[in-house]
């Protein structure tokens, strides 16, 4: 045994296992590394950080309006695709963004990002929808209350913030998810590839669906008289949206 130990080569790796030391010989192997991205076609704007958002719209007079819950219901038709960046926060439900949410996103992302190699832009407008509120202890009646604050309505599928630059998705995924968890609606960090993969998976589920009893088939055939409990909106959206909530598993 001692003769075998004398033949051990000089360069050894020593590792500590509990109360004893074990000597391991060095080993070499083939390594395949991914090519390093060059970011040759990426241009950084002069003002790369998120801009400050006004708390009140700069208009002479704002009219009070009803709730209009249709502003947060259903799929979004604006800001659904990338424009300049490659990463963004995708809204998975409807809701209202207050001025505090804009400040939270601006301060968190600007503190993290490198302005020389990254940039971020808003994809949603500043708060413009007035929300009225009456004081505590005030009697009912007397007309609509005074304007208390302003919000920005967001629908499902809307990109809230967009980021890009000389960086990869794994570098910004953590900070984007941290911001997404603090929003008043479900959201997640996505990239161009992950967003396209989500749309592709949804199309494949619709084409390869083997269950004939879909919501569209049941509602169209008026089974058990279900049409009297549905609205025209349920027929156009095929039951995938319930108010501001989105049900992605429904085909």
UniProtKB/Swiss-Prot annotation:
Locations listed in the record: Mitochondrion
GO cellular component: mitochondrial inner membrane; mitochondrial large ribosomal subunit; mitochondrion
Entry protein name: Large ribosomal subunit protein uL16m
Keywords assigned by UniProt, alphabetized: Mitochondrion, Ribonucleoprotein, Ribosomal protein, Transit peptide
Organism superkingdom: Eukaryota
Primary location group: mitochondrion
Native source species: Mus musculus (Mouse)
InterPro entries xrefs: Ribosomal_uL16, Ribosomal_uL16_bact-type, Ribosomal_uL16_dom, Ribosomal_uL16_sf
Name of the encoding gene: Mrpl16
Family: Belongs to the universal ribosomal protein uL16 family.
Transit peptide (residue range): 1-29
């Amino acid at each position: 045994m001692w003769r075998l130990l004398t033949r051990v080569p000089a360069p050894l790796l020593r590792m500590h296992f509990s109360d004893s030391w074990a000597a391991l010989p060095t080993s070499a192997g083939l390594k395949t590394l991914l090519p390093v991205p060059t970011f040759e076609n990426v241009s950084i704007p002069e003002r790369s950080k998120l801009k400050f958002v006004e708390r009140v719209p700069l208009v002479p007079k704002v009219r009070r309006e009803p709730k209009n819950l249709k502003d947060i219901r259903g799929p979004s038709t604006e800001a659904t695709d990338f424009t300049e960046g490659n990463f963004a926060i995708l809204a998975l439900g409807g809701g209202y963004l207050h001025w505090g949410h804009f400040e939270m996103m601006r301060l968190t992302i600007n503190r993290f990002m490198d302005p020389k190699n990254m940039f971020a832009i808003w994809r949603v407008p500043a708060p413009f929808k007035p929300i009225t509120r009456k004081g505590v202890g005030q009697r009912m009646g007397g007309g609509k209350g005074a304007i208390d604050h302003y919000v920005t309505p967001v629908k499902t599928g809307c990109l809230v913030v967009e980021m890009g630059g000389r960086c990869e998705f794994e570098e910004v995924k953590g900070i984007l998810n941290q911001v997404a968890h603090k929003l008043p609606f479900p959201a997640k960090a996505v990239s161009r590839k992950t967003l396209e993969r989500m749309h592709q998976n949804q199309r494949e589920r619709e084409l390869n669906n083997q269950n004939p009893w879909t919501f569209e088939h049941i509602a169209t055939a008026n089974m058990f008289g279900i049409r009297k409990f549905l609205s025209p909106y349920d027929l156009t959206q095929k039951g995938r949206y319930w108010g501001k909530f989105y049900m992605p598993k429904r085909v």
